[in-house]
Design a protein with these regions (language model features):
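Short active-site-adjacent helix-start/loop capping segments
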Residues: 29-30, 56-59
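Consensus positions within tandem repeat domains that build extended binding/scaffold surfaces
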Residues: 38, 58-61, 81-86, 104-109, ...
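Surface-exposed cap/linker segments adjacent to membranes
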Residues: 1, 24-27
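The feature captures the LRR N-terminal capping module
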Residues: 1-19
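Structural signature of tandem-repeat unit edges
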Residues: 16-25, 42-56, 66-79, 89-102, ...
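A generic local structural motif
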Residues: 5-6, 33-37, 112, 127-128
Length: 150
């Protein structure tokens, strides 16, 4: 299954449950109750792979993909939108790439299985609610110094 949306193409491999996003620039934003192009296969998505060239993950892009366990993000990514991975209840750990600058409010809200997050030195702004209601989150690794954090 393949589809193109503005500057972004997506494809889904049913055997692996992998949704691959390719393109350049910013991903579209969606409203909280607006259907994304992959809405019909949302419950089958086990892995999201965003390729080099993409600079953002749009608002609500992968919201409520409850089978999503793995996310691969490129070093070209600089922005994670509001609710971008909200309600991804099977997601266990996230390594944010060097290059990301902004993580918006509730980007990982209610990711109840999320245990570990790695934050890069490039991070400039993280909303205090980015990981709200992630009760299992017990490990946050920052790859910079204390002075860089402040």
């Amino acid at each position: 299954m393949n589809e193109k949306l503005n500057n972004v193409e997506w494809s889904f491999t049913q055997e692996t449950g992998c949704l691959t996003i390719t393109g350049t620039g910013k991903m579209q934003n969606w409203a909280e109750h607006q259907e994304r192009p992959w809405e019909e296969i949302r419950d089958e998505i086990r892995r999201v792979r965003i390729c080099v060239g993409m600079e953002s993950v749009g608002d609500c892009a992968f919201q409520n993909c409850t089978s999503l366990k793995e996310v691969e993000l490129p070093e070209t990514l600089v922005y994670l939108g509001v609710y971008s991975f909200r309600g991804c209840t099977a997601l266990r750990d996230v390594k944010l790439p060097e290059g990301i600058c902004i993580i918006c409010a509730k980007a990982f809200h209610n990711c109840s299985a999320l245990e570990k997050v790695e934050l890069p030195v490039s991070l400039k702004n993280i909303d205090m609610r980015a990981f709200a209601k992630d009760e299992a989150l017990h490990t946050v690794i920052y790859h910079g110094t204390e002075a860089q954090w402040e």
